[in-house]
Amino acid sequence: MQVSDFHFELPDELIARYPKAERTASRLLQLDGNSGQLVDGTFKDVLELVEPGDLLVFNNTRVIPARMFGRKASGGKLEVLVERMLDEHTILAHVRSSKPPKPGTELYLGENDEFHAVMQARHDALFEIRFTAETVVLDILNQIGHMPLPPYIDRPDEEADKERYQTVYNQKPGAVAAPTAGLHFDQALLEQIQAKGVELAYVTLHVGAGTFQPVRVENIHDHHMHAEYVEVPQEVVDAITATKARGGRVVAVGTTSVRSLESAAQDALQKGTELKPFFGDTEIFIFPGYQYQLVDCLITNFHLPESTLIMLVSAFAGYEHTMAAYEHAVKEQYRFFSYGDAMFIRKQMTKA
């Protein structure tokens, strides 16, 4: 398949630049992967769509204030976007400046040069930067960092984004983009879902800035995914095994939860073992033709044209059904991307 197969026209006004006042106030488009049937509704419908015995799997990563502004010792301005923290004092980052800094370049970060750092090495498009202060990276980011809103939101971050660009159940700092399907859940809805007899479980995938990189090849088979760190702990493996045994469904909240679970499944397949905990980097790329091992239903936002994430959805619901659903969403003026509306998708049981 070609990248252009996943193109759709999206009017600019449908890109959500701010979230709704209430998390659960978004709209929800249901898609049945078998029939292609579409149902328009609101996000609170999720409570009716999940059933006792189901398992909801969330990504509990926490978005770090990963964008910093500063200057080189020579005076040139720069912007640093953390891709991942390598240790308590070192980051791997994207750097925007008039000229890329060379190894040994001294950097001053923060509005008032609060923190001194040194560019250590370059790894392809990323820069390894070490802070000289005793303060740990996470504390530095909390002092001078900005929330790394996606480029298409196209506005500076505001105070409200510190809360609204996080899920209510976040636990483990490390992401530079939110697992956005989870933004629709508030504490009350989570409690109602649990009261209905639905189990909740948490994986961790620290979303990298690479999630916003365009696919730069025409044939999707030639695309190489960026690596992201994943944790699928023993309790999640146990919960999935128990859910499948009782005939319940595994409902993944967000494409990052899907990629976490399916990474663990692929690891077990390759090793010829039963499902086991998975801790490590994943470069899993899911596109039509992929056979899902664990996930039965998917809650996800609307994704960018020609992105790896619309390809993942197409593998789940079928290509034709997915593109028809997106056409419907544009026509019905759903809000798109991170702060936008959501879908609830039942997996296509036949091959896409």
UniProtKB/Swiss-Prot annotation:
Pfam families: Queuosine_synth. The keyword S-adenosyl-L-methionine applies. Its EC number is 2.4.99.17. SUPFAM superfamilies: QueA-like. PANTHER family: S-ADENOSYLMETHIONINE:TRNA RIBOSYLTRANSFERASE-ISOMERASE. InterPro entries: QueA (IPR003699), QueA_dom1 (IPR042118), QueA_dom2 (IPR042119), QueA_sf (IPR036100). GO terms for biological process: queuosine biosynthetic process; tRNA wobble guanine modification. Keywords: Cytoplasm, Queuosine biosynthesis, S-adenosyl-L-methionine, Transferase. GO terms for molecular function: S-adenosylmethionine:tRNA ribosyltransferase-isomerase activity. Belongs to the QueA family. One of its GO terms (cellular component) is cytoplasm. Monomer. It is found in: Cytoplasm. Transfers and isomerizes the ribose moiety from AdoMet to the 7-aminomethyl group of 7-deazaguanine (preQ1-tRNA) to give epoxyqueuosine (oQ-tRNA). NCBIfam families: PRK00147.1, queA. Pathway: tRNA modification; tRNA-queuosine biosynthesis. This is S-adenosylmethionine:tRNA ribosyltransferase-isomerase. It comes from the Bacteria. It catalyses: 7-aminomethyl-7-carbaguanosine(34) in tRNA + S-adenosyl-L-methionine = epoxyqueuosine(34) in tRNA + adenine + L-methionine + 2 H(+).
